[in-house]
């Protein structure tokens, strides 16, 4: 895929293997596993831990130099083979071709005019690499015994990909040969490039991603070399950190949830050819047709011959795109930053505020989001801030006053302020909080803009600085908006403007406008680093309205996530990383792996 696939294709690994004994390598692997499985560092020590883990990984990589084996040639040499295989499998092959789009990398180009909502691409199940196909492969015996593989389908897909790459008779070779040999995810950043992200909201996820990948690699290196059920895997002689990093990134940037053959549940899959499509703003136009057992994609808009065909990956922030897709999307209509807010349990009015929030379906403590759009806060955050700033009298009115239950419906509605004083307090709070968050960055926005003008800036540094700047611009927007709102409501108060009064008949107005939906009817997504994308979330705006089609988002469930396990001798080897819900609407807690 596009920007995610700016790569330097490597030649086959024919260099001499570094002189290292199996025992020496196993000792290094054990040291890495121990380091990555230790307790989380104390606050402020995460970077130090990252540097230490990275030093161990680099030591291992140096000793593994020349051991990785990849395909001779460059990616485009194999595109014709991919198309021929697709035709053989009865996938769609007409109306488009794979083409290079400069800064966006490879993508699909229309070879004829395509109308909006026209079905132009379908991929049958037989072409997909799935957790189910992994179970039926050489990886099956190990899968049946290993708790990590059973808990983490993404890891299963990564090892499945490596095993098939090493199998000269694999049916998926035409696909695997066209995958990038490197990616632009932070796993490929140099230490100094990662340093640009220090003090950003993204840094913790970046450091966790690296630590978890290193831990998984060390664990599976031991498993591959010691577990009886791994004896037939074609990885024993060549399973390097670079191999695993490549497989993780390939899966992280491409995996999707599709239904199993019987439709009873979902499974993870890599979808050849379709995953060449690059991202743009829009709507989900891909779904899985259970009746025909294939992935189907309709055109997002009208495309003229020669134009690039895009798909919509979902409502992801640029932090998600950078961390899990390896690119920064300049025109991201869904960009946002996280803001953690909560009512202090030591506050005198805590019980009353918590009760009002509970009635509105909002936790007393949660991670919300500030958006790049106008307004910068959603209905959920507005409701939280109103309750957060309520006086005891106002709280009592929403608990036991006239129409108290119905008034809960107005908390997220801009047309029904609690009071002018409440509005002034909440916007003052937001303005102050955003300003404080801005002070945590080590550079000013103008400094970032100046750095981006340097012609010798590396691609990864450019991506990191763009993300850092975008975070600040969203916070600056929140400060500006908060100030303007504060002044507006102060003027209303000073002029004695009448407060809009809620009447019971207004409930019809609230229920007939999506932007004014009662908070209690909207799902508040709590970002506790565990977002899972639901495949059955079709909106009325989605093109695939057929109930037999399940929407598909490219690269969803990005991280190699799973439940935390304690493999034999490994300690807490696998930590569950953040999962995101790219398809969620403007719900709080949206933040979550890159491209083609």
Swiss-Prot record:
Sections of the chain in a coiled coil: none
Swiss-Prot/TrEMBL catalytic activity: L-histidyl-[protein] + S-adenosyl-L-methionine = N(tele)-methyl-L-histidyl-[protein] + S-adenosyl-L-homocysteine + H(+)
EC identifiers of the protein: 2.1.1.85
Keywords: Actin-binding, Cytoplasm, Methyltransferase, S-adenosyl-L-methionine, Transferase
Record-given protein name: Actin-histidine N-methyltransferase
Every SET domain range: 94-314
Record's function text: Protein-histidine N-methyltransferase that specifically mediates 3-methylhistidine (tele-methylhistidine) methylation of actin at 'His-73'. Does not have protein-lysine N-methyltransferase activity and probably only catalyzes histidine methylation of actin.
Molecular-function GO terms, alphabetical: actin binding; histone H3K36 methyltransferase activity; histone H3K4 methyltransferase activity; protein-L-histidine N-tele-methyltransferase activity; transcription coactivator activity
Compartment annotation: Cytoplasm
GO cellular component: cytoplasm
Sequence positions that bind S-adenosyl-L-methionine: 75, 104-106, 254, 275-279, 325-327
GO biological process: actin modification; cell population proliferation; peptidyl-histidine methylation; positive regulation of DNA-templated transcription; positive regulation of transcription by RNA polymerase II; regulation of cell growth; regulation of uterine smooth muscle contraction
Pfam family for this entry, one: Rubis-subs-bind
Taxonomic classification: Eukaryota, Metazoa, Chordata, Craniata, Vertebrata
Family of this protein: Belongs to the class V-like SAM-binding methyltransferase superfamily. SETD3 actin-histidine methyltransferase family.
Compositionally biased region (Basic and acidic residues): 575-596
Chain positions covered by the region annotation Disordered: 556-596
Swiss-Prot/TrEMBL domain comment: The SET domain specifically recognizes and binds actin, suggesting that it does not accommodate substrates diverging from actin.
């Amino acid at each position: 895929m596009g920007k995610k696939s700016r790569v330097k294709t490597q030649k086959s690994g024919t260099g001499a293997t570094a002189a290292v004994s199996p025992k020496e390598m196993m000792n290094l692997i054990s040291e890495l596993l121990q380091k990555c499985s230790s307790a989380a560092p104390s606050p402020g020590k995460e970077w130090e831990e990252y540097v230490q883990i990275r030093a161990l990984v680099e030591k291992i990589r140096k000793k593994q130099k020349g051991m990785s084996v990849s395909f001779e040639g460059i990616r485009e040499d194999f595109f014709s083979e991919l198309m021929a295989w697709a035709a053989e499998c009865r996938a769609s092959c007409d109306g488009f071709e794979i083409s290079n789009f400069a800064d966006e990398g490879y993508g699909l180009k229309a070879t004829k005019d395509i109308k909006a909502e026209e079905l132009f691409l379908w991929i049958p199940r037989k072409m997909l690499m799935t957790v189910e196909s992994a179970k039926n492969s050489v990886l099956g015996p190990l899968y049946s015994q290993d708790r990590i593989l059973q808990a983490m389908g993404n890891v299963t897909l990564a090892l499945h990909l490596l095993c098939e790459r090493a199998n000269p008779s694999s049916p998926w070779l035409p696909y695997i040969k066209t995958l990038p040999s490197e990616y632009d995810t932070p796993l490929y950043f140099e230490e100094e490039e990662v340093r640009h992200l220090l003090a950003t909201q993204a840094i913790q996820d970046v450091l966790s991603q690296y630590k978890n990948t290193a831990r998984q690699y060390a664990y599976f290196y031991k498993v591959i070399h010691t577990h009886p059920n791994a004896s037939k895997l074609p990885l024993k002689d060549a399973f390097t950190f670079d191999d695993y990093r490549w497989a993780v990134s390939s899966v992280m940037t491409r995996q999707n949830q599709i239904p199993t053959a019987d439709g009873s549940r979902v499974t993870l899959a890599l979808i050849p050819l379709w995953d060449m499509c690059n991202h743009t703003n829009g709507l989900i136009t891909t779904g899985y047709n259970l009746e025909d057992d294939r992935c189907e994609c309709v055109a997002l808009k009208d495309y003229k011959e020669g134009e690039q065909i895009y798909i919509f990956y979902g409502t992801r922030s640029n932090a998600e795109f950078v961390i899990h897709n390896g690119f920064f999307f300049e025109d991201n209509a869904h960009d946002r930053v996280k803001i953690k807010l909560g009512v202090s349990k030591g506050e005198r009015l805590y019980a009353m505020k918590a009760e009002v929030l509970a009635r509105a379906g909002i936790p007393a403590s949660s991670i919300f989001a500030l958006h790049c759009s106008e307004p910068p806060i959603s209905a959920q955050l507005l409701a939280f801030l109103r309750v957060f700033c309520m006086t005891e009298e106002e709280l009592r009115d929403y608990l036991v006053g006239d129409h108290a239950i119905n008034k809960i419906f107005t908390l997220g509605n801009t047309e029904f302020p609690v009071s002018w004083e409440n509005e002034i307090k909440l916007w003052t709070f937001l303005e102050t909080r955003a300003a404080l968050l801005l002070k945590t960055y080590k550079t000013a926005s103008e400094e970032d803009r100046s750095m981006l003008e340097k012609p010798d800036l590396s691609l990864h540094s450019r991506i990191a600085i763009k993300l850092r700047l975008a975070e600040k611009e969203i916070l600056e927007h929140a400060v500006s908006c908060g100030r303007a709102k504060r002044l507006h409501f102060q003027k209303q108060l000073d002029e004695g403007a009448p407060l809009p009064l809620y009447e019971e008949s207004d409930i019809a107005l609230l229920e007939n406008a999506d932007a004014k939906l009662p908070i209690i009817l909207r799902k508040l997504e709590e970002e506790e680093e565990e977002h899972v994308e639901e495949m059955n979330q079709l909106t009325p705006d989605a093109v695939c309205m057929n109930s037999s089609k399940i929407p598909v988002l490219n690269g969803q469930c990005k991280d190699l996530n799973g439940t935390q396990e304690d493999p034999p001798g490994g300690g807490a080897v696998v930590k569950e990383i953040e999962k995101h819900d790219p398809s969620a609407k403007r719900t709080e807690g949206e933040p979550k792996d890159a491209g083609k």
